[in-house]
């Protein structure tokens, strides 16, 4: 059985880890970094860039450089959070035919899972380069507060990238695995506060150790899937834009190029202010008007940044209270607080969390890598490489159906340990009703329309009977990935209808298969491109070495041969500028044929050089046999 890799598919950065024996190892990507920016760029010449190369060219290609795609995955275009992003993102967010939020990439509507798949492909390639073997299976993490549609869309992204997603696990749970696996922790209750690039989660987790076996049980989870470092950046960007407008009278919001430079500078300033008290945002030639170029130079203090984002940090505190309440615990019951996600490096975040829990968060967990490590550990559990670990996760939101009067009736309450199964019997609302519609919902509100609709299906063929008589058993079954399967059965007729909940939107099987095929076709074209580059390099090398040999042969090379070689060199040189690998190989072959005489001369010259150096060594050796001696003239005594 091959390795199951662990992938933290983050909003801002992604990370991949594997189990190396009994320890998890975070892998470096091709650029030598342990994390990869979750940025994808589509260049003018049709190339797809992922990670650092995509980030580097963002300033010159803002409309086709996509970031923070995780905020759109599994969401509807009309969602309030999506509409907020529509107005601030440099790229184009559009409505798909089914109402989902998709992206317009160079005039083509593209689904978020398809774009996230590019990041997953890079993670897959990083692992394959390290292991030296194909990788086909992965554990991928998601925010604990992701709903069913978002989890399903993440699995779809994995499939498009050529990965069988063996398990979807929650990010805070993964971080707890990373924290608790190699520590003699005994029985402890920990709080994992996870503030990443685009999402926020809090999970209360109990680690029990009995006879060396550790059980990680999630007691409660809460969060906000649209709160993260990107929002902190946006606050700082808006402040800088407003200051510049006050000073220069120019609104940079209308200039995508300037906004992209500003985004980079704001992110850098935010990071610097975690260790410094103030920083300069210095952007020469940010824009120009009739009077000439304009430069931005604005001082930002840590206190200013904190005042801009204080309400965002406070927004993360409310879910902490709810999670503790749901777990039936008080602050004093928490033994350790673990911070995960890059945004938790901000001193203000650390201070607020410490104030809430009444204790300093632990500093021995890497906030950027813990989640990927935990995913790799879960991969190890699934392959049997990691033993004595049991993970009990929960469903983050209540699941139920719409019943008479537009009410949501929950079948499975939030924070129920998964996998789980629950059945309940319902009946008809009208006399002689022959069909019922099962409308599946996720959320905590009483009114059905205030919750997230996960889909609906019909159960037909109910025998005519007075209202309230037929018995329809509805069963909810949540698997270990947190994905829901629903069935409805008429107990009288035995008729049954089952569905796996795919978001009423989401990607259908046909679309996923099409995207998988496109990804495979891209992989094939990538392979062909790589082979073309290798052939070009060989051709370049042959050009260079042949020219050098012609020069060294001088007059020894007959004029006819020289002309034939020159003509073959010119033909190869022109072929190297094209895209035809077979033609380059043919021209290389033709040059080799024309150069036969040249090869003979080169071999003779080489043999002569060898002989010459052998003679020189031999004469040196003869000289070495001569012993230098001093003679003293002895005169006979007379």
UniProtKB/Swiss-Prot annotation:
One GO molecular function term of this record is: ATP binding
Spans annotated as Disordered: 599-638
Name the InterPro entries on file.
Answer: ATPase_NBD, Chaperone_DnaK, Heat_shock_70_CS, HSP70_C_sf, HSP70_peptide-bd_sf, Hsp_70_fam
Task: List the Gene3D superfamilies.
Answer: 1.20.1270.10, 3.30.420.40, Actin, Chain A, domain 4 (3.90.640.10), Substrate Binding Domain Of DNAk, Chain A, domain 1 (2.60.34.10)
List the CDD domains hit by this protein, alphabetically: ASKHA_NBD_HSP70_DnaK-like
Briefly describe its induction.
Answer: By stress conditions e.g. heat shock.
Indicate the segments annotated as coiled coil, or none if absent. Answer: none
Sorted alphabetically, which Pfam families does this protein's record hold? HSP70 (PF00012)
- According to the UniProt entry, which residues carry Phosphothreonine? 199
Q: Does the keyword 4Fe-4S apply?
A: no
Q: Which keywords has UniProt assigned to this entry?
A: ATP-binding, Chaperone, Nucleotide-binding, Phosphoprotein, Stress response
Among SUPFAM superfamilies, the record links this protein to: Actin-like ATPase domain, Heat shock protein 70kD (HSP70), C-terminal subdomain, Heat shock protein 70kD (HSP70), peptide-binding domain
Which superkingdom is the protein from?
Bacteria
Low complexity bias spans: 602-620
Keyword hit for Manganese: no
Protein role: Acts as a chaperone.
What family does the database annotate? Belongs to the heat shock protein 70 family.
Q: Which HAMAP family match?
A: DnaK
State the name under which the record lists this protein: Chaperone protein DnaK
**Encoding gene per record:** dnaK
């Amino acid at each position: 059985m091959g390795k199951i890799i662990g992938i933290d598919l983050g909003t801002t950065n992604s990370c991949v880890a594997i189990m190396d024996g009994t320890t998890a190892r975070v892998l470096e990507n091709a650029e030598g970094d342990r994390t990869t920016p979750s940025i994808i760029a589509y260049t003018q010449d049709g190339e797809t860039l992922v990670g650092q190369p995509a980030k580097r060219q963002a300033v010159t290609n803002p409309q086709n450089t996509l970031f923070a795609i995780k905020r759109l995955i599994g969401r509807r275009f009309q969602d309030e959070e999506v509409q907020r992003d529509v107005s601030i993102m440099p790229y184009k967010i559009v409505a798909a035919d089914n109402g989902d939020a998709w992206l317009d990439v160079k005039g083509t509507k593209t689904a978020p899972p398809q774009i996230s798949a590019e990041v997953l492909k890079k993670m897959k390639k990083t692992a394959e380069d390290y292991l030296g073997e194909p990788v086909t299976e992965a554990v991928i993490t998601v925010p604990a507060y992701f709903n069913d549609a978002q989890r399903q869309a993440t699995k779809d992204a994995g499939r498009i990238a050529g990965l069988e997603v063996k398990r979807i696990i929650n990010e805070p749970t993964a971080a707890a695995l990373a924290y608790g696996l190699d520590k003699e922790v005994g029985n402890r209750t920990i709080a994992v506060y996870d503030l990443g690039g685009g999402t926020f989660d809090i999970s209360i987790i109990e680690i029990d150790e009995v006879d060396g076996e550790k059980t990680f049980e999630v007691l409660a989870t809460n969060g906000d899937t649209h709160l993260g470092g990107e929002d902190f950046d946006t606050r700082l960007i808006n402040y800088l834009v407003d200051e510049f407008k006050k000073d220069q009278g120019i609104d940079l919001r209308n200039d995508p190029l300037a906004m992209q430079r500003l985004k980079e500078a704001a992110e850098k300033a935010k990071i610097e202010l975690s260790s410094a008290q103030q920083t300069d945002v210095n952007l020469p030639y940010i824009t120009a008007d009739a009077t000439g170029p304009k430069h931005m130079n604005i001082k930002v203090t840590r206190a200013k940044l904190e005042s801009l984002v204080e309400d965002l940090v406070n927004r993360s505190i409310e879910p902490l209270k709810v999670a503790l309440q749901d777990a039936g615990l008080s602050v004093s019951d928490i033994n350790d607080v673990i911070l995960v996600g890059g945004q938790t490096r901000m001193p203000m975040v650390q201070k607020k969390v410490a104030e809430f829990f009444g204790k300093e968060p632990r500093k021995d967990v890497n906030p950027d890598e813990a989640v990927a490590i935990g995913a790799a550990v879960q991969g190890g559990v699934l392959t049997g490489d990691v033993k004595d670990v049991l993970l009990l996760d929960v469903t983050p939101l209540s699941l139920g159906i719409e019943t008479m009067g537009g009410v949501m009736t929950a079948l499975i309450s939030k924070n129920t340990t998964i996998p789980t199964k629950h059945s309940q019997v319902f009946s008809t609302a009208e006399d002689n009703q022959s069909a019922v519609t099962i409308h599946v919902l996720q959320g905590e509100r009483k009114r059905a329309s205030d919750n997230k609709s996960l889909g609906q299906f019909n159960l037909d063929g109910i025998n005519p009977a007075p209202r309230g008589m037929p018995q329809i058993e509805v069963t909810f079954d949540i698997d270990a990935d947190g994905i829901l399967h629903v069935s409805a059965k008429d107990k009288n007729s035995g008729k049954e209808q089952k569905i796996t909940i795919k978001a009423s939107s989401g990607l259908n099987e046909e679309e996923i298969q099409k995207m998988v095929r496109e990804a495979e076709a891209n992989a094939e074209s990538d392979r062909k491109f790589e082979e073309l580059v290798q052939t070009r390099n060989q051709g370049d090398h042959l050009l260079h070495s042949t020219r050098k040999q012609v020069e060294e042969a001088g007059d020894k090379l007959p004029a006819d041969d020289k002309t034939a070689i020159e003509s073959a060199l010119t033909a190869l040189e022109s072929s190297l500028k094209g895209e035809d690998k077979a033609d380059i190989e043919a021209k290389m072959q033709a040059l080799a044929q024309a150069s036969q005489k040249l090869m003979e001369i080169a071999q003779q010259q080489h043999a002569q050089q060898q002989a010459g150096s052998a003679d020189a060594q031999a004469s040196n050796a003869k000289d070495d046999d001569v012993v230098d001696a001093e003679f003293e003239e002895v005169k006979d005594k007379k």
